[in-house]
Amino acid sequence: MNRYLWTMILAFTVSLTASAQLYQPGEVLSYRVSYKARLFPNTEVATVDVRTTLDTLYGRPHYKVHGRGVTMPAYRWFFTVDDSYYIWVDTLNNRTNRFASDIHEGSYTFRSEYLYDRANGVVNTRWQKKQLPERSKTMQISERGMDPVSLYFNLRSEASNSFREGESRRLEMVLEDTVRYLEFRFVGREVKRIPKMGKFRTLKFKCQIGTSDGFSFTDGTEFSIWITDDDNKFPVYLESPIRIGSICAYISKCTGLKYPLESLVKR
């Protein structure tokens, strides 16, 4: 699977709009990741937890969001994944000031850290693959530039009643040494059945990760995402086609929500 797609799934199933108020200390969202193909109908292969707590960074209060994805025990003999993603978000303006990742996938290891300098419009990134020397880079970003985890929360804040069916918007996603673009289009409202959870009123979006050229989406990665049509606006389902079959992630448990779960229409 495309590594950027796996990053997005973990970040999603692991923001610049201050009025959204979507960071909620104590919120825990748990997901199951499954693989579907002709000979493997809906095989659950991994779990993802996204937790929000309070922390301190630079002497100021921050929301700390930790997204962790691991393969289920039955599949660890085949391929082991234990990935963690973190962001620190200023509680006063909801701007991300730091991102970190710690990735273990089989024999592959990867660590990264992004430090945002919003005043100068740059992000300072450093990363290390396996035992190779650490690399670093400083990149210009716009006000909408962010890491995948912050982008996930920003998409939640963007999913508002202001959207019109067919309308597209674009966000910038920082990935180590480059900036990729995420274009998302509002498909419409849909009642979505989630395994073992029930039926939800949702907002459906079609998303595409562009190339490093910025505005070319012809060979990017596509996925669809369903977000609750209530004030919580958290993803309940994500699906992306791959060469053989598809990968999907769906909510399995949610606790500590800020608002009532009014989108759940039937268990």
Where are these regions (language model features)?
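Positively charged n-region of N-terminal signal peptides that target proteins for export
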Residues: M1-L5
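Bacterial N-terminal signal peptides
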Residues: T7-S15
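Sec/Tat signal peptide C-region and signal peptidase I cleavage site
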Residues: L16-A20
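Acidic, serine/threonine-rich low-complexity disordered tracts
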Residues: Q21-R118, N161-R267
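Active-site/ligand-binding surface loops and adjacent short beta/alpha elements
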Residues: R118-D177
